[in-house]
């Protein structure tokens, strides 16, 4: 069965319709394909349902960059510029805007001090922390329109970019009136944009198909 290697700002994934795979082996960069995660997709009555797994094999209810990659894969197959994708327990809207994929996501739920849930749990760290309970985001405000972000992802480690981490970091600083309603997020892997309209966040990034292969 074919698999598709994708990346969005260096956050890379294997997309496949194969259901029974060893996620850890597939993600291993020395003995497998190499990726931050695996996204298993299923087309059910013209609906796209996908589940995301971290590199260590653990399940995650949401992955922003992963969702953008699936959206690009799906819209190219459907020859469309708009789609709906179920990831985990929610359905998301995605569309092309010039060279970017844009996804629409409900604003995060505030759980505690700097701690949010956006499908998965993220903390905007104001100090150096070590935890395996949630994703950690280290953000620097360069100006009211620009953030620099690094994310340590639960089940993966340091990644070149994290879509949900960028969205949560933006939202955290936006509700504290430290950034404007639309920002550019700079990560080690590249640039994305996040903005807010009513109760929804919009995340825009370029997703790229790196190569296609066959999985035994």
Where are these regions (language model features)?
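Active-site donor-binding segments of glycosyltransferases and PAPS-dependent sulfotransferases
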Residues: 101
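A glycine-rich beta-to-alpha transition motif near the start of alpha/beta enzyme domains, typified by
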Residues: 1-98, 116, 122-216
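Active-site glycine-rich loop that binds ribose-phosphate moieties when present
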Residues: 104-112, 132
């Amino acid at each position: 069965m074919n698999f598709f290697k994708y990346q969005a700002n260096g956050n890379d994934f294997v997309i496949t319709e194969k259901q029974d795979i060893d996620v850890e082996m597939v993600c291993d960069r020395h003995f497998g394909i190499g990726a931050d995660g695996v996204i298993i997709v299923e087309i059910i009555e013209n609906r796209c349902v996908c589940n995301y797994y971290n590199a260590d094999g653990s399940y995650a209810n949401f992955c922003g960059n992963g969702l953008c990659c699936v959206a690009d894969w799906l819209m190219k197959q459907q020859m469309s510029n708009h789609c709906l994708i179920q990831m985990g327990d929610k359905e998301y809207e995605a569309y092309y805007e010039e060279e970017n994929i844009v996804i629409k996501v409900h604003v995060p739920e505030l759980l505690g001090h700097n701690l949010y849930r956006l499908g998965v749990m993220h903390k905007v760290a104001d100090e150096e922390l070590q935890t395996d309970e949630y994703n950690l985001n280290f953000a620097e405000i360069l100006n009211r329109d620009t953030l620099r972000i690094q994310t340590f992802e639960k089940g993966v480690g340091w990644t070149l970019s994290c879509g949900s981490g960028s969205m949560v970091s933006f939202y955290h600083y936006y509700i504290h009136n430290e950034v404007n309603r639309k920002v550019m997020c700079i990560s080690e892997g590249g640039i994305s944009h996040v903005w807010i309209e009513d109760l929804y966040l919009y995340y825009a990034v370029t997703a790229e198909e790196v190569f296609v292969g066959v999985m035994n």
